[in-house]
Amino acid sequence: MQTSNITNYERNDSSWMSTVKSTTEVSWNKLSFCDVLLKIITFGIYSPHETLAEKYSEKKLMDSFSPSLSQDKMDGEFAHANIDGISIRLCLNKGICSVFYLDGDKIQSTQLSSKEYNNLLSSLPPKQFNLGKVHTITAPVSGNFKTHKPAPEVIETAINCCTSIIPNDDYFSVKDTDFNSVWHDIYRDIRASDSNSTKIYFNNIEIPLKLIADLINELGINEFIDSKKELQMLSYNQVNKIINSNFPQQDLCFQTEKLLFTSLFQDPAFISALTSAFWQSLHITSSSVEHIYAQIMSENIENRLNFMPEQRVINNCGHIIKINAVVPKNDTAISASGGRAYEVSSSILPSHITCNGVGINKIETSYLVHAGTLPSSEGLRNAIPPESRQVSFAIISPDV
């Protein structure tokens, strides 16, 4: 914490931390909200330093915070609360989190360190707080999902309920990289995938993996393809051959899907959207996943997750790609050409954590591919901004 206005204690004095620790000896219900908030940002609400009574009081305080409306966020405000008649605001501006509150008729502010900010985020209630374009978080909680749904669906549900954003600046820097590996990436993924590990959707309609495999084969994507090659678009006859080999020709039930895929597979922007979603550099490496997990465990998060080392979880990785057609209102080039733009969301969900549940790291990239984008290294490089990646962590308790 760079300043210490929320207490009378000096940040740089060695007595500051001892004072924080000594507050556990004070009757908890006599502590001011400032003292409680100070303990939360110092240790986190799930710290083993806290007793159950203290955690209850901390949770009660944090439950008072609500997401701020968009019109309230001129200075980056993302949460607010009114506690004991005192207005408190949490703001994030240029990557720095500040706590604002009224002290009499004066507004006091405190800037939080990175660790204090993370402690604060992990202590927020399970509501969605918008922290700007890059970070939209749901406060992390452990969940028990009793369902007979397939594992990928359970994982996706849990991810949406139990996530914590991890800063990505140290792990994702693609400003100086190209897409030279993209053709090999999609070839390896599709060749190795089965229906349980990779799912591809267009406007919520699942695209069969065999259909995608036949498509990339017809496009000339194989293990020997030149990484610099610009893909040549398929003719109607080529696409029609792929469609007819995957759908019964006389079955009218598939007529809508056949017409849809026939149109999509001749659109260079769709091919760009599809192939770019497999680019390996969009996703975190396994070593970074292990490093992040070690950091989480070292900060006593295992206390919240009921960490049990003797129970193992088999490693698994699911790849979910969602492509939606969009027509931006203000893009005259798109409307004039009559083409379509595509919004892509590519998520990898590796489970590899040792615990009494399933640990998930969600690595997600979302970006827009404009109409007419050519499926080439240059076209893809221009389509995907480096700031679009985010990593989140979740725990799922097994169905018992």
Swiss-Prot record:
Entry keywords, A to Z: Hydrolase, Plasmid, Protease, Secreted, Thiol protease, Virulence
Record Pfam families: EspG (PF06872)
Annotated stretches, region: Tubulin-binding domain: 224-315
Enzyme Commission identifier(s): 3.4.22.-
Highest rank taxon of the organism: Bacteria
Subunit and partners: Monomer. Interacts specifically with alpha tubulin, a major component of microtubule.
Family the UniProt entry places it in: Belongs to the protease EspG/VirA family.
Name of the featured protein: Cysteine protease-like VirA
Species: Shigella dysenteriae serotype 1 (strain Sd197)
